[in-house]
């Protein structure tokens, strides 16, 4: 959270607002905030770190046999939405911006990348090792990486003027727009508007809630606490009855609350 606050403050003071295409506000869950937090907190990682990679870039690189950081194909989706990458300012935020944010970031920009690719472009073919492990052939083409909700929108058949809601541990609201329609508009408060992050040749827009299913799971555990800790340890019932009662009650909590909530005018 501290790192994100520092990034937002510096974006507001700098001659270029690098958060402009990310809704005008940078999240603590995103690339630079996470990387800086790790560099500050972990001396061992700080001493050894050469570059920084997103998981959706690392996995395609791994299974295609890429072993050098410089050869990893970088994701337009990941970098545009989370790393403040944009062609308008030549890719990533400037070295001066990053080192002003924290000198610990010095040198990383030159060891990262300038270019990103959309997910429709193959990154290579399965390496012999992974072809054997997966029971496939080395002719299998591996697509570029992107975030799960963006690819969920592709799978749902997203088109302009449709809205795809991807619900899970978080909720992601995804749309696409033509260049002509979005023009020079900058939409405040969303998680980014990125050329080609969903469908190449269109601007992908993402919004949503970073916590959704996780919060429901936490809430359910809070409500279950007296059942498991009091009923589950009661001496008034035998073990089988306690287990059945606790399981039934836990399974009915959220549906029962939902039914009551639906009655509220």
Enumerate the predicted regions with their spans.
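Short glycine-aspartate micro-motif
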Residues: 52, 139-146, 155, 162-166, ...
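Conserved phosphate-binding catalytic cores of ATP/NTP-utilizing and phosphoryl-transfer enzymes
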Residues: 9, 127-136, 146-162
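Short hydrophobic-aromatic micro-motifs
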Residues: 26-27, 165, 173, 203-207
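Glycine/Thr-rich phosphate-binding loops that ligate phosphate moieties of nucleotide
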Residues: 1-13, 43-47, 65-69, 83, ...
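Gly/Ser/Thr-rich active-site cleft segment
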Residues: 14-144
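Short beta-strand scaffold segments in enzyme catalytic cores
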Residues: 82, 151-155, 171-175
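Short, well-structured active-site flanking segments
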Residues: 166-167, 247
């Amino acid at each position: 959270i501290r790192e994100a606050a520092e990034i937002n403050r510096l974006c507001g003071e700098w001659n270029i607002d690098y958060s402009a295409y990310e809704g005008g506000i940078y999240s603590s869950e995103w690339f630079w905030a996470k990387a800086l937090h790790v560099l500050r907190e972990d001396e061992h990682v700080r001493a050894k770190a050469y570059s920084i990679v997103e998981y959706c870039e690392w996995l395609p690189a791994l299974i295609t046999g890429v072993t050098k950081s410089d050869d990893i194909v970088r994701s337009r989706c990941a970098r545009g939405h989370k790393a403040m990458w944009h062609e308008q300012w030549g890719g990533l935020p400037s070295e001066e911006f990053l080192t002003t944010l924290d000198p610990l970031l010095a040198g990383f920009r030159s060891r990262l990348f300038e270019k990103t690719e959309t997910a429709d472009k193959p990154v290579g073919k399965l390496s012999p090792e992974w072809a054997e492990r997966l029971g496939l052939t080395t002719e299998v083409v591996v697509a570029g990486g992107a975030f799960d909700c963006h690819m969920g929108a592709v799978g749902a058949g997203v088109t302009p003027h449709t809205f795809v809601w991807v619900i899970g541990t978080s909720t992601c609201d995804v749309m696409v727009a033509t260049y002509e329609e979005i023009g020079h508009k900058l939409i405040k408060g969303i998680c980014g508007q990125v050329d080609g992050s969903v469908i190449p040749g269109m601007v992908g827009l993402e919004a949503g809630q970073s916590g959704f299913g996780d919060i429901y799971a936490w809430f359910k555990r809070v409500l279950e606490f007296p059942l498991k800790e009091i009923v589950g340890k009661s001496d008034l019932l035998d073990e089988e009855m306690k287990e059945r009662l606790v399981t039934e009650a836990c399974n009915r909590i959220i549906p029962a609350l939902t039914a009551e909530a639906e009655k509220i005018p």
